[in-house]
């Protein structure tokens, strides 16, 4: 065998300690049987000698066999036996993390959630995660708490003293499309069947573009222009819009998929870009009582679940603190994150129809009103903007002395509670980096309402006129 110039194999934590090889890349473990089997991908250049290589091959074979046996375990045969699950949980929180090119960030999200659960915050509630660790493989996991710590590996990712992972279901299908409406319904329904609860919360992580239709639904003549329009600038930092092209669910399809589950969520939390869009929120108003979302891009790291999850499992898991979630998100990006870009808002969906009724009065009274579009706050770096501040737009078209404007502002306070409309002084956008230092765009004082509209946008005017929000307000 001599010197082997390149050797890559899946090895366990113990091999690292035995051989001292460097350059390990952690991968999401193949969760199974109530425990966590930690794996690492290792690259070894110029392996020391044939004897060591034989020893390495021997250990790898043993580990491969162990992994085979491990993934074949029943729940009762896992390394750390599961405690009994409640017949009906106080709350089931579902993570729906879709796509593979945010994989490392999703793995960090899962790790952070485990870190929170390790502190014994679940009580009578449950947390399930849908994730796609690689193309062609999708799975539903459950994160649970146990007093046992049989398989704890100090310092290793996905290994905690008391939070463990169980694989409930796998899909090994290269054609599996997690953003197909039928698939969304199937997966969420499955999670609800496995973890029935008195109330449900849903966290959606992935790529978002607000209400804007998928490029494939724009007519063929405009398709390439649509793609070019949303192309990120060179050297852009990763956000939760970039990637997994061709696999998107438009908002009406998403709302229908949620509705087909028969569930009504207490809250939706969008860990995705541009989802605090009035057009998108209005489509989703029947799916949940509250929606947490950002009007601009969300950095690829997303929400900091180590600190967020305790707010979602308040009062021993029997309730949730959504304003606390917004505050925690804002605090993280304001004070701890490298890129200080964090804008967030909480929507009370039951107040969206009264808001639409007031906006209709204003739009009817001021049809075709001229205004300075350039003076409005926007939430991306595009030369031709798509997402404008909703309150700024209405204030621009409505006379300042009109009582309708006071009525609108009062209703905005009910629909988007002021204490949960939070923002950093500027936001990051992968679009139009040449126009702003380091991709950062300033939010002007007094111009942030936490929700966008595309009413002033001309590029997508025909599509915008087909939205439910347009029909409700015109």
Positions of predicted regions on the chain:
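Terminal, contiguous helix-loop blocks that mediate binding/assembly
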Residues: 227-474
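N-terminal module-boundary/linker segments of secreted carbohydrate-active enzymes
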Residues: 76-122
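Sec-dependent bacterial lipoprotein signal peptides
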Residues: 25, 44-71
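Loop/turn elements at helix/coil->beta-strand transitions in domains of secreted/extracellular proteins
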Residues: 89-92, 122-127, 195-201, 262-267, ...
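Targeting/processing segments of secretory and organellar proteins
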Residues: 7, 22, 33-36
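Catalytic-core segments of thiol-dependent peptidases
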Residues: 132-135, 139, 143-164, 175-261, ...
């Amino acid at each position: 065998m001599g010197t082997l110039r390149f050797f890559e194999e899946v090895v366990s934590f113990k091999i690292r300690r035995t051989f001292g090889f460097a350059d390990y890349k952690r991968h999401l473990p193949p969760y199974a049987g109530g425990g966590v089997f930690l794996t690492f991908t290792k690259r070894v250049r110029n392996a020391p000698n044939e004897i060591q290589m034989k020893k390495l091959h021997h250990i790898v074979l043993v580990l491969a066999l162990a992994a085979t046996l491990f993934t074949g375990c029943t729940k009762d045969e896992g390394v750390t036996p599961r405690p009994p699950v409640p017949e009906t949980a106080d709350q089931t929180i579902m993570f729906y993390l879709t796509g593979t090119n945010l994989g490392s960030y999703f793995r960090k999200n899962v790790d952070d959630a485990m870190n929170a659960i390790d502190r014994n915050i679940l009580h009578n509630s449950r947390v399930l995660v849908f994730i796609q660790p690689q193309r062609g493989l999708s799975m539903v996991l459950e994160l649970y708490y146990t007093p046992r710590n049989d398989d704890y590996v100090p310092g290793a990712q996905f290994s905690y003293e008391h939070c463990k992972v169980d694989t409930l279901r796998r899909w090994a299908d290269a054609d599996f499309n997690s953003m197909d409406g039928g698939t969304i319904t199937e997966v969420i329904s499955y999670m609800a069947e496995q973890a029935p609860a008195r109330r449900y919360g849903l966290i959606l992580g992935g790529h978002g573009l607000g209400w804007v239709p998928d490029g494939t639904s724009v007519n063929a003549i405009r398709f390439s222009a649509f793609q070019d329009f949303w192309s990120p600038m060179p050297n852009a930092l990763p956000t939760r819009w970039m990637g997994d092209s061709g696999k998107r669910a438009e908002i009406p399809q998403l709302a229908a998929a949620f509705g087909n589950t028969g569930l009504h969520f207490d809250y939706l939390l969008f860990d995705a870009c541009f989802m605090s869009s009035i057009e998108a929120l209005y489509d989703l108003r029947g799916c949940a009582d509250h929606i947490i979302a950002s009007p601009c891009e969300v950095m690829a790291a997303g929400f900091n679940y180590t600190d967020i999850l305790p707010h979602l499992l308040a009062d021993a898991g029997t309730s949730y603190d959504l304003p606390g979630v917004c505050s925690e998100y804002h605090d993280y990006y304001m004070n701890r994150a490298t890129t200080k870009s964090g804008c967030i808002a909480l929507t009370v969906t039951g107040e969206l129809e009264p808001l639409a009724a007031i906006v209709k009065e204003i739009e009817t009274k001021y049809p075709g009103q001229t205004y300075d579009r350039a003076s409005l706050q926007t939430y991306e770096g595009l030369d031709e903007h798509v997402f404008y501040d909703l309150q700024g737009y209405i204030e621009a078209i409505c006379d300042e002395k009109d009582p309708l404007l006071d009525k609108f502002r009062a209703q905005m306070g009910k629909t988007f509670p002021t204490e949960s409309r939070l923002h950093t002084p500027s936001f990051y956008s992968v679009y139009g980096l040449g126009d702003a230092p380091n991709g950062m765009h300033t939010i002007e004082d007094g111009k942030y309402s936490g929700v966008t509209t595309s009413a002033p946008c001309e590029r997508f005017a025909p599509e915008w006129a087909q939205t439910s929000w347009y029909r409700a307000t015109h």
